């Protein structure tokens, strides 16, 4: 067992070229602040799917499925499950508001900006938690942190792309519904962002949240369920 890095704890030691391996083998207990997380991998090599189970914290969202998706060229967890018994809703925990998620994104981006020379190896949604109680994203369990030129842009890009992928994944039915009506499709900014995304041009996550809020909640008379 070992302590998981949370919110850039002990970052200064990494700026001194120290390297940290994973804080324990998969299936052992990890510490997240004062709570204990039991993180269990079930790896199926054939379809490259990884499952996570059992987390002891009522406020933490944690991925339940992980895909290794060639399109985004990084490990991507596309299902984030709120494990307090409320189930999955649109990739984010039940009760998380769009404005809160957007602010959490802005806040963590600012933190990443402070450490532009630190590269976060193995950043993926499997290692990005959304904490509803504090309205914040946390980065945990990175394989290595090390000084790197132009790390800031790479870190921001991966963080941004992971979250965009998760949001698109869980709203494809709404996007398809909007896109099936020609008049809406021609005016639909969300559909345009999705087309760009399919071409591997990821939108800014903040812009995407704003667009989802407007296009889905207003145009289609639907309310996003988070």
Regions found by a protein language model. Give the residues of each.
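Conserved structural core of kinase catalytic domains
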Residues: 59-104
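Conserved hydrophobic "DFG−1" position in protein kinase catalytic cores
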Residues: 31-32, 82, 129-131
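C-lobe/activation-segment region of protein kinase-like
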Residues: 131-226
């Amino acid at each position: 067992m070992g302590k998981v890095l949370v919110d850039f704890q002990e970052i200064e030691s990494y700026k001194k070229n120290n390297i940290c391996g994973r804080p324990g083998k998969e299936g052992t207990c990890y510490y997240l602040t004062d709570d204990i997380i039991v993180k269990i991998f079930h790896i199926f090599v054939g379809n490259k799917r990884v499952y996570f189970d059992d987390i002891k914290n009522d406020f933490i969202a944690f991925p339940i499925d992980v895909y290794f998706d060639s399109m985004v060229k990084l490990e991507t967890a596309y299902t984030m499950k709120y494990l307090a018994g409320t189930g999955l809703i649109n990739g984010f925990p039940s009760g998380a508001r769009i404005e809160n998620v957007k602010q959490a994104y802005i806040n963590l981006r600012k933190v990443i900006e402070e450490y532009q020379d630190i590269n976060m190896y193995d950043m993926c949604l499997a290692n990005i938690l959304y904490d509803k109680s504090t309205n914040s994203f946390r980065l945990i369990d990175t394989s290595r942190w090390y000084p790197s030129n132009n790390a800031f842009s790479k870190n921001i890009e991966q963080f941004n792309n992971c979250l965009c992928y998760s949001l698109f994944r869980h709203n494809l039915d709404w996007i398809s519904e909007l896109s099936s009506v020609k008049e809406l499709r021609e005016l639909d900014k969300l559909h345009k962002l999705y087309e760009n995304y399919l071409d591997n041009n990821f939108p800014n996550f903040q812009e995407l949240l704003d667009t989802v809020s407007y296009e889905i909640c207003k145009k289609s008379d639907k309310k996003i369920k988070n």
